[in-house]
Amino acid sequence: MRLYDTLSGGVRDFAPLRPGHVSIYLCGATVQGLPHIGHVRSGVAFDVLRRWLTAKGFDVAFIRNVTDIDDKILIKAADAGRPWWEWAATYERAFTAAYDALGVLPPSAEPRATGHITQMVELIDRLIERGHAYCADQEGNGDVYFSVSTLPEYGKLSGHRIDDVHQGEGVATGKRDQRDFTLWKGAKPGEPSWPTPWGRGRPGWHTECVAMCEAYLGAEFDIHAGGMDLVFPHHENEIAQAEAAGDGFARFWLHNGWVTMGGEKMSKSLGNVLAIPAVLQRVRAAELRYYLGSAHYRSMLEFSENALQDAARAYSGVEDFLHRVRVRVGAVVPGEWTPKFGAALDDDLAVPAALAEVHAARAEGNRALDAGDHDAALTYAMSIRAMMGILGADPLDERWESRDKTSAALAAVDVLVHAEVRRREDARARRDWAEADAIRDRLKEAGIEVTDTGDGPQWSLLDGTDK
């Protein structure tokens, strides 16, 4: 199997550190708000990697973290008048529901940043002792920074020259060099904080992931994955800390492309996001999964309604063939994938080529079925089930088999919407009618209507499905 490694800048042979075992760390969500389809693309892309490695016989340890302490979480929770931990927990559940709705396998472990403060403090202590980190010059303010100039190879992942680096953290009090980045943030009034040898505070984002990677996978592991927007500064700064601490860290760095609209990354700040509930009005969850996973994971996925509907039709074509075989021939169990399918996934997860094999088998299977060759049709159907299962989209899997719009996908949507409905109720309780109306309007833009009834607020999809 060959994978594109961002660090080396090319496709190279993959072999795990331990024969038969693969260790993967995927940067998960910063749980500051509801997920959109751009958020979950990495979950789908690397779920395919995990499924393929498992199908090949590897024992896969797959870690996906939750960033539950962050500047944006604190700001948004404060603006809403809610505890930061409640805010984070609410949207962590929303992300979990979104992953589940799209058939993403649960991770082997899903550590929260706040559960690993001890490991973060120990890591920072090591970096200070080795001369790669320092406490802020202002006595007792609690800030700790990584000294970029102490690591000559800094920038090797992203290609940034060390002299051109700017961390985007503004002019930080006590920072000796503007290229340096934050490891620990000194406590501020009203913010959560933890005790450390250098004062109370909370961790920096980059330190969180290094500590969690090593806590679960060790000082050296196989694959670190995430969106391409994380290459710099996040992943660059992870490498810097790990190597400065004397650890081997990740051997492969994999990065998925963005979901774009009009050539721009899908982002709340740009106002071009597509909420998952809104998309699930147009297509079923399995069809959305198929769409998000159909492009090569490293390519940009430009969203369009036509492309989404094309993907839905392609998925339905596979589904219809399998149903025809089951009705006319009998039970269809997963069989063997084709050699070309396996070769495609072994070539840096070339899902488009793998899907071409699926649709070639469907075409041949339909011809065999129409010709009355039931044995051949069944063989093709069994192969398709195996291939689509590896892609996480087997239409005959019990997860996807219901064609009813009020299936498990809608239950997941309910969890996503509940967080916003609760915020609206809180605003109404404060008699903040403007905020309550704004939340209702945002939900309506996502295709969800909220109606106040004697039994409390009820929401419905605009096609009339009530909850």
Swiss-Prot record:
Family matches, as CDD domains: CysRS_core (cd00672)
InterPro entries: Cys-tRNA-ligase, Cys-tRNA-synt_Ia_DALR, Cys-tRNA/MSH_ligase, CysS_C, Rossmann-like_a/b/a_fold, tRNA-synt_1_cat_dom, tRNAsynth_Ia_anticodon-bd
Cofactor(s) annotated in UniProt: Zn(2+)
Keywords: Aminoacyl-tRNA synthetase, ATP-binding, Cytoplasm, Ligase, Metal-binding, Nucleotide-binding, Protein biosynthesis, Zinc
EC annotation from Swiss-Prot or TrEMBL: 6.1.1.16
Any GO CC annotation of this UniProt entry: cytosol
Keyword Zinc on entry: yes
GO molecular function terms listed in the Swiss-Prot or TrEMBL record: ATP binding; cysteine-tRNA ligase activity; zinc ion binding
Highest taxon above the source species: Bacteria
Residue ranges of the motif 'KMSKS' region: 265-269
Location(s) in or outside the cell: Cytoplasm
Binding-site positions, ATP: K268
GO BP terms, alphabetized: cysteinyl-tRNA aminoacylation
SMART domains documented for this protein: DALR_2
Gene3D superfamilies: Cysteine-tRNA ligase, C-terminal anti-codon recognition domain, HUPs
Catalytic activity: tRNA(Cys) + L-cysteine + ATP = L-cysteinyl-tRNA(Cys) + AMP + diphosphate
Similarity comment: family membership: Belongs to the class-I aminoacyl-tRNA synthetase family.
Subunit structure: Monomer.
Protein name: Cysteine--tRNA ligase
Species in which this protein is naturally found: Mycolicibacterium gilvum (strain PYR-GCK) (Mycobacterium gilvum (strain PYR-GCK))
Gene of this entry: cysS
